[in-house]
Amino acid sequence: MKKLLLLAATLTTTFFAKAQDEPKIKVTGYLEAYYGYDFNKPTDHNRPGFIYSHNRANEVNLNLGFIKAAYDTGNIRANLAVMAGTYANANLTAEPGVLKNIFEANAGVKLSKSENLWIDAGIFSSHIGFEGAVSKDCWVLTRNISSENTPYYESGAKITYGTKDGKFTATALYLNGWQRITRQNGNDKPAGGLQLSWKPTAKITVNYSNYLGTEGVDSVRVNRFYHNIYGIFQLTDKFGVTLGFDYGTQQKQKGSDDKNEVISPVAILQYKFAPKWAVAGRFEYYEDKNGIFIATGTPEGFKTKGYSLNLDYSPIANAVIRLEGKAYESKDKIFAREGAAVNANAALTASIAVSF
């Protein structure tokens, strides 16, 4: 922690000093504190194992806090952000040393004077899904199951092209793996992906993303192919709908044509009933019978429905106070309550998030 604080202080001081002479540098920050109450009362204060954001129960904690410096001249860009919080502890346990505290670190160069064509390399946010690590930017407080079990971040290089009217963007990615900053030891195969985003109007976004890579050391590695599609529709100034669908496959064993599958639809409705108030409801279903991402050891595997209701109050534009109730209902008894296996889990989560 001392190293992290020293790094953050040095980063902030350096970039603020440079910002006086170089206005193209911008320093921002984000902090979200939360309290989660799990009605199953886990003795280790951890939410179920497939949850990585807001994953601590029956305690007040920091989910995510970061300081970010961004540099952009129009032809060159770079971002560096260091972070702390339970989000970092849960998501970056496999990363070595201070990499556990890197939220973002990338640099890019514009490849064309006339076209919006860029190449970027480093550590950046995932290209999969409509929910990211910054809860304030999402319609609901906590993440859906598919967002929790696809990458929050990735490292590698990407080429991005955007049309001049901003309506279409295409990105091709070369990656070190599935949510990995460093490559898996013993695996020499790179991974990659594609993202296509279409915004015909300011109120509609349609996105398709995929990922193709391998898991495991080379001697036993299996292929993974994942697809994500979603649409965000702001139907009126007050009412919006988000629809998402994920489908993934993974070889059962190397050289086999047999595959395991994962499937997950999700729907979110948001209604802004007053200038500073909003309510949102979510339904989701996640099926991973053979444990590609969520292993249960039960006959039917992970087949779970999720329901949540969210209330938001934004006293000012850069802050939000939120309360969410969430319930999971599983086909098999995959949750624990007082030492017994049960089919359900419910939780209340409250948070305060501020960007600056």
Task: List the predicted regions and their residue ranges.
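Outer-membrane beta-barrel pore domains
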Residues: 51-54, 88-93, 98, 132, ...
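Outer-membrane beta-barrel channels and translocator barrels
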Residues: 22, 72-76, 112-114, 126, ...
